[in-house]
Amino acid sequence: MDRNSVTGLAIIAVIMIVWLQFMSPEKKPLLPSKTVKTETVVQSDVQVPAVSIPAADNFGVFASSSGGQEKLLKVENDLFRATLSSKGATLKSLVLKKHLDGNRLPFDLVSNGKNGALSLLFLTREGKKIDTRDLYFSNVTLDTLRTIKGKESYAVRYHLDVAPQQAIDIIFGFTGDSYKVDYDVKLTGFASELAGNEYQVQWDGGVPFSEKNRPDEAQSALASAYLGGSLVKLDASKEKQSYREEQSGEAQWVAVRNKYFVAALIPHGKSAGIYLDGKRETGNDFESYLAALKIAVPSTAGVVDDKFSLYLGPLDYNIVKAQKVGLEKIMDFGWDWLTRPFAEFIILPVFSWMNGFVSNYGLIIIIFAFLIKLVTYPLSMASTKSMKKMSALQPALKELQEKYKDNPAKLQSELGRIYKEAGVNPIGGCLPVVLQMPLLFAMFYVFRSSIELRQHSFLWAKDLSVPDSIFDFGFAIPMYGSHIAVFPILMAVTVYLQQKITPTTQSNEQMKVMMYMFPAMMLLFFNNMPAGLGLYYLMFNIFSVAQQFYINKTTTAADMPQVNLGLAPAGAQRKQKKGGAKK
């Protein structure tokens, strides 16, 4: 490896480590707002004891509906088991059937199981703030349990009579094979009663954490919205601070997410804006979020009939993108102009294609590494041969540097000529590595946040989306972490071996330093990376070592450059110095 190659690789390694430490953007707190306290309670009883009716001055015309008896209805399809409540016409539980939590237990997407996650919120002209979770609806559907499969559909309708000619209807629509739930809102005779001529549809409580590493998952948890072609994010990461974001405009969706799952509200018609807020409780990694759509209501409307969809499920790129509202934008693949295209148009499509005939994602990663090596083979082959030629030129170049040591301009001119005649590029050694950086960073984002690798094992790695830790220290070592991962160690060995057999233009001392420093830096960087990323880089290095062995074995003296250095033979130089220049 020449000096430029080593310098380039060292800079890349430093960038990777610094990027790892500072990749999370700073979260700016806003003014304090109401704390949203969350609980995880799954209601299992069909009927809940009645409660007393609150005072009329809290609910106005809704006072008669603020007390009653709660009735639960369970709906099960191929993908989840949902529990609906007549108190609030809300969703109290949604347990995913094909995805478990970090302890391999059933995972409930609803964090606010006591009050429910979904509701309407509005202010009456009397100044009463109404959250429909405080109201008792009648269930037009008399079932207590319904199971549907495949393309079967099922609707649950809740009705609330408020006053003569005034009513609220909320209808849930389920399909047997879909994470999407239809959510219809019908307001009769309310247009003139709503202050500000609007109401909100909200998801309250965020999404529960699903993984064992809660601090890591907290980095992915947020509330988000997509409106006007722009992504809005709210990340409540700091304790004792409230965060709030409110914007007007037509939104395609609002959502809350954790690392691998999302709950999204998607309007079928126009929305008037969005409202997001969040807070992290003291001493708790969990971040509670609220995401709401603002819906305008014409003051002259007798009946308001608004339709929405809920997407309640995994952050699976293909499924999320199939919603056709840009919901895939909530998935973090890094820089939109650099790493995201690699993730969306190369990594995920290739993985999805290979998963059609290879079920093990460890094998898919190995095949992918081989394919990338195959694609970059011409470039890396040319680069390696160029480095080998550079190594062969070193004795002559040192002689040239000695001759023109007092004339830097002439030296650079001669070096350029010689490089051109020899067909070498002095910076070509690090070019393949530099070109792979966007792909490597994109793979980091994909492996860290996409559900495709989650809980898929390979060899000793139990989960390819997290480090392949075999031993935990119980404390953190700065820059290294709190555990020992195997793939990074093996990868560092292959980096060392690759440098060992690669031609170099460095001095022995320089070579000794880089032979150990660069593998060590890569070990530090990859120890906390997903196991899938370490496996990819390990296999890519193994293929690179095999390629280097092949080049070293097949390259002969005839392949080495023959250039005219423009230097006189040593004897002629001595005669010229003794006799002086000819006149």
From Swiss-Prot:
Known PANTHER family for this protein? Answer: CYTOCHROME C OXIDASE ASSEMBLY PROTEIN COX18, MITOCHONDRIAL, OXA1
Membrane topology reported for the UniProt record: Multi-pass membrane protein
Q: Which GO terms describe its cellular component?
A: plasma membrane
Indicate where this protein resides in the cell. Cell inner membrane
What functional role does this protein have?
A: Required for the insertion and/or proper folding and/or complex formation of integral membrane proteins into the membrane. Involved in integration of membrane proteins that insert both dependently and independently of the Sec translocase complex, as well as at least some lipoproteins. Aids folding of multispanning membrane proteins.
> What's the name of the protein?
Membrane protein insertase YidC
Q: Name one GO biological process term.
A: protein transport
Molecular-function annotations in GO: membrane insertase activity
Q: Where are the transmembrane segments?
A: 5-25, 341-361, 362-382, 427-447, 473-493, 520-540
Q: Which gene encodes it?
A: yidC
Q: NCBIfam families attached here? A: yidC_nterm, yidC_oxa1_cterm
Pfam families the UniProt entry points to: 60KD_IMP (PF02096), YidC_periplas (PF14849)
- The primary site where this protein sits is membrane
* Keyword hit for Coiled coil: no
Keyword match Signal: no
Q: What binding partners and quaternary form does the record give? A: Interacts with the Sec translocase complex via SecD. Specifically interacts with transmembrane segments of nascent integral membrane proteins during membrane integration.
Q: Which family does it belong to?
A: Belongs to the OXA1/ALB3/YidC family. Type 1 subfamily.
| Keywords, comma-separated and alphabetical | Cell inner membrane, Cell membrane, Chaperone, Membrane, Protein transport, Transmembrane, Transmembrane helix, Transport
Name the CDD domains on file.
5TM_YidC_Alb3, EcYidC-like_peri
**Organism's domain of life?**
Bacteria
